[in-house]
């Protein structure tokens, strides 16, 4: 009974945090606004267009041009309603699907070729629990836009149920989704990208770590060596599980960054559900991961109410801070924190670095 009550509380928190619409196209005869091209790979079946909740053992690849409205506010997704308007809503300006992963790689190379060599980084975003295809697509478009990321974004949409009551289904889907992410990483690391960065949120962190582990165990060092960094945001991973994954991977991609918040109510409820207070995204002390070369970024000070499960993407103040840093990758590494590129307190414990960001110091 207690578990059912906690699940209901999780559902209420996650559904009350924001309105979520769906995908809609720019109406015929209207001009798109600011365009962000987003490549995608998904292991969702096309049971309900665009992509539903059922699992597919094969991947579908494509490209979507996302139109971002001029009224956009940092940290938000302006969802379309019954009357989609490119001046007010996130919309699809154009869509394209590829026959296979090689086709997507060719399309990716075309986009990369138009960029300055220093801007040819590719970011692979892996969404979290309770996400639909549209959530992951629009979220990486929003983050890329708000942070002014110069590279190319790819979203991996694994078959989450998009329902806060289906946590068990999503946990199983996270394991199911490993092969699809592995295939995507293989294709992207064969592209002309200068470097490949993995960014994952919540339960997507489990998908990411399991996939990195599989790459190492299978001996795919080519793909692993092309990964220039990993960012886990509010990771929903048991600490002991994470340690076994990290041990199997061996030398972690550098930088390896974890964003956390002690006010993350979603992870706190999951800890109560599992009766274990050891989620990676809510550690009390960086000593827990001191043996690993990791930068643990505490963004508790940027919590703004609600469930606080995604402040890195939703806090306007934090987005503004990160967006103003000239070299964000260096700033979020341990050395960057010590050189004062970001405001806050830096603690070093063995191999790990804790960076506690301070909005007061940033004024």
Feature roles, as predicted:
Residues 1-7:
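Bacterial N-terminal signal peptides that target proteins for export
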Residues 13-16:
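C-terminal motif of bacterial Sec signal peptides marking the signal peptidase cleavage site
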Residues 18, 22-98, 106-112, 116, ...:
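Lipolytic serine-hydrolase domain surface
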Residues 124-128, 201:
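The conserved beta1-alpha1 loop
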Residues 127-128, 210, 234:
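Short catalytic micro-motifs in class I SAM-dependent methyltransferases
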Residues 131-136:
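Short substrate-entry loop that stabilizes the transition state in hydrolases
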